Amino acid sequence: MKIELSMQPWNPGYSSEGATAQETYTCPKMIEMEQAEAQLAELDLLASMFPGENELIVNDQLAVAELKDCIEKKTMEGRSSKVYFTINMNLDVSDEKMAMFSLACILPFKYPAVLPEITVRSVLLSRSQQTQLNTDLTAFLQKHCHGDVCILNATEWVREHASGYVSRDTSSSPTTGSTVQSVDLIFTRLWIYSHHIYNKCKRKNILEWAKELSLSGFSMPGKPGVVCVEGPQSACEEFWSRLRKLNWKRILIRHREDIPFDGTNDETERQRKFSIFEEKVFSVNGARGNHMDFGQLYQFLNTKGCGDVFQMFFGVEGQ
């Protein structure tokens, strides 16, 4: 099913398993500004097509803010992050069962002149099934999407073909320790950026709320401030709702990870990068002692398997 995005005409012309874009198909007559405008127009269309709560999640809000700012100023200078969002769809996998399929989408700067990076996940898919689905989706995009926006085409392809990748044994028997409804659960990890975190009351709230909601992760006070929380999606959303209501100079979700899982305690613990929630105060720099040692932060993230997040936060390679 080919879906065309309607817009004003242009001038002429986190995963080895994912449908990773290869910069094979180029559209040389499309300039950078037109590419950016096409990305924003498609994102607006997706928001209207997936209006439900948690149907469309913008994982990197700063990237979208940068995109809008560049379009408004008519320059691509200052753009450092790729647009990253997740589409969650409840799909029929049998006559009596539905399951959530998540499409994690990253738009390269030159998209739609090059293909997007899309990774499809579901708790009902084995590793081999997931790999095959993503491989076939890549082949579909390479064959049918030459310089065109194609996220809606990808969602329709998944909607039509996903059930074929779920084996009969998997779809007919619930995962051990879970129920049919449990396939709708999401394990979430929020990476929150703040201009600064100094206030002792705020720091206390962060620790107490994380404990109350059974979230793991860490907070790093100072300038800038960093908070990471992970756990069931509903608990992470509640934490963010409380945190953003406090008085901040600037605070936003810099990066977001949403992973479908079966809801069992064993699976929850397996998904965690952090065993507890704690405040991390690294060796400080500066006369006031408000600036953290980012080298130590990077090393800490690396030990937790999160080193790639450092560049997403600060725009530079960690070392």
Swiss-Prot record:
Disulfide bonds listed in the record: none
Phosphoserine modifications at: 275
Residue span(s) of domain RWD: 41-165
Keywords: Phosphoprotein
Pfam family, one: RWD
Tissue specificity field: Ubiquitous.
Superkingdom of this protein's organism: Eukaryota
Protein name according to UniProt: RWD domain-containing protein 2B
Underlying gene: RWDD2B
